[in-house]
C-alpha cells in the first residue's frame, strides 16, 4: 500500500507542476494520456466503466439542450467572466428551474465551474462550444438518432454487416430511401453542422499530402494536359493549397463535386483552377489527367459503391496517370484506440461503410484492377492517415 501512497504523491506533485497546455508537445501529450488511460483501467473495478457506458450519451444530449437554450452564446457575448443563475436566465430561453439542472450537469462534467453557489464560469471547453466546434455536437446528436435504432436494425436483418450505402442503418432509423448526403440537402441545420465539422477536421489534419509526396518528380506534365483532378473536393480547399505551394507547375487543376456544392463556392477560384459539377458515379469527363485525387471520399462508401467510383476513374486514366487516395487508415494493432473504432461504427451506421486498414485499402484498389505503387504516411496526431499511390 505504501507504493500506492507514493504513486499518489507523485501524481499530485506532477499535476502541480504541469506546464501550460500550449507548451506541451503533441507527441508527449498523447503518450501521457495513454499512460493515464492505462492507470485508470488498472485501478477501476469493472462496475465503474459499466456505469460510464450507461451514462455517456447524456453528455451530448445535455450540451445540445444547452445549445438550444442559448447558454454558450450567452457566455460568448457576455463581457463578464462569470454569470449568476439569475443573469444567465435573463439571457437564454427556457425556465430557470430547468436551466439550473442543465448547468448543474455541465458543471459535473467540467464544462463549467462554480466559483460560488449558482454562479457559473465557463471552462475552455464551454468557450469552444460557442464557436464552430459546437457544431460537432449538433452533428453527433443527429447521428445518435441512428445509434438508438442500431440494435433494432440488426435484430431485423439477422445481424448481417451492412454492405449497401442505400440500405444502411441511417435509412432504417430515419425511414427514408435517400442517401445521407441527399438527406442533408433537405435539412439546412444538419447540413450546416456537417459542413462545419468537415472544415474543423481539415484544420486538425496535420501535413498536406503534397508535403510528403514528391510532386515535382512524380507529377511533371505538359501545359495542354490537366495536372490534377480533385474528385469530391468540396469547395476547393485542397487544390487551392496545392496551387499556393506549386504556383509554377504547368497544367490545370480541376475540383469536382456535386453541382450544388460547386455552386456554393464563394468568389472566384485562383487562375489555373476550374470547378466542375460532377457526380463521381457517372462517367468521368476529364480524360488522361496526370493525377486523380480523392481525400476522405471513399471511406464514406462501402466496397460495393467504392468499386464503382474507382471504375469510373480507371476507364479514363492514361498509361502514365496516377491515382492518389488520401485516407484515414484504421490501426491494425491489438490495442486499438477508442476514436478510430468509434469512427468505424459511425461509418457503418451512416453509410454502411468502414474505416479500412492499410491492408483493406490495398485489397480494394487491387480488386479495382489498380497496382499500388507505394503507401505514403502522412504525419498527424492521434489518427493514422496514408496516401495511396496507384497506377494502371
Task: Please provide the spans of the model-predicted regions.
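C-terminal alpha-helical "lid/dimerization" subdomain adjacent to the S-adenosyl-L-methionine
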Residues: 328-368, 373
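NAD(P)H-dependent oxidoreductase Rossmann-fold/reductase module
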Residues: 288, 340-343, 392
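Conserved adenosyl
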Residues: 8, 13-17, 93, 102, ...
Amino acid at each position: 500500500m505504501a507504493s500506492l501512497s507514493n504513486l499518489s504523491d507523485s501524481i499530485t506533485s506532477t499535476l502541480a507542476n504541469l506546464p501550460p497546455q500550449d507548451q506541451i508537445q503533441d507527441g508527449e501529450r498523447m503518450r501521457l494520456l495513454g499512460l493515464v488511460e492505462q492507470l485508470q483501467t488498472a485501478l477501476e473495478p469493472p462496475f465503474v466503466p459499466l456505469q460510464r457506458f450507461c451514462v455517456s450519451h447524456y453528455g451530448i444530449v445535455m450540451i445540445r439542450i444547452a445549445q438550444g437554450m442559448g447558454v454558450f452564446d450567452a457566455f460568448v457575448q457576455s463581457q463578464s467572466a462569470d454569470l449568476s443563475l439569475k443573469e444567465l436566465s435573463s439571457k437564454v430561453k427556457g425556465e430557470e428551474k430547468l436551466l439550473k439542472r442543465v448547468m448543474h450537469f455541465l458543471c459535473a462534467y467540467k464544462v463549467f465551474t462554480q466559483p460560488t453557489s449558482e454562479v457559473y464560469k465557463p471552462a475552455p471547453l464551454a468557450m469552444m462550444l460557442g464557436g464552430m466546434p459546437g457544431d460537432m455536437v449538433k452533428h453527433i446528436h443527429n447521428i445518435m438518432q441512428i445509434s438508438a435504432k442500431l440494435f433494432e436494425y440488426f435484430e431485423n436483418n439477422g445481424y448481417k454487416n451492412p454492405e449497401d450505402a442505400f440500405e444502411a442503418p441511417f435509412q432504417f432509423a430515419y425511414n427514408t430511401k435517400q442517401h445521407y448526403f441527399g438527406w442533408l440537402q433537405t435539412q439546412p441545420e444538419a447540413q450546416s453542422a456537417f459542413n462545419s465539422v468537415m472544415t474543423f477536421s481539415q484544420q486538425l489534419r496535420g501535413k498536406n499530402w503534397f508535403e510528403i509526396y514528391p510532386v515535382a518528380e512524380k507529377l511533371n506534365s505538359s501545359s495542354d494536359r490537366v495536372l490534377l483532378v480533385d474528385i469530391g473536393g468540396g469547395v476547393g480547399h485542397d487544390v487551392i493549397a496545392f496551387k499556393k505551394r506549386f504556383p509554377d507547375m504547368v497544367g490545370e487543376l480541376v475540383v469536382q463535386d456535386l453541382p450544388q456544392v460547386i455552386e456554393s463556392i464563394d468568389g472566384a477560384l485562383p487562375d489555373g483552377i476550374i470547378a466542375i459539377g460532377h457526380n463521381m458515379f457517372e462517367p468521368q469527363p476529364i480524360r488522361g489527367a496526370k493525377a486523380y485525387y480523392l481525400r476522405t471520399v471513399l471511406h464514406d462508401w462501402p466496397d460495393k459503391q467504392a468499386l464503382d467510383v474507382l471504375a469510373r476513374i480507371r476507364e479514363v486514366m492514361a498509361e502514365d496517370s496516377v491515382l492518389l487516395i488520401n485516407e484515414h487508415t484504421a490501426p491494425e494493432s491489438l490495442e486499438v484506440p477508442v476514436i478510430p473504432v468509434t469512427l468505424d461504427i459511425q461509418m457503418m451506421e451512416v453509410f454502411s461503410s468502414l474505416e479500412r486498414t492499410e491492408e483493406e485499402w490495398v485489397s480494394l484498389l487491387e480488386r479495382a484492377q489498380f497496382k499500388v505503387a507505394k503507401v505514403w504516411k502522412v504525419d498527424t496526431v492521434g489518427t493514422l492517415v496514408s496516401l495511396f499511390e496507384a497506377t494502371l
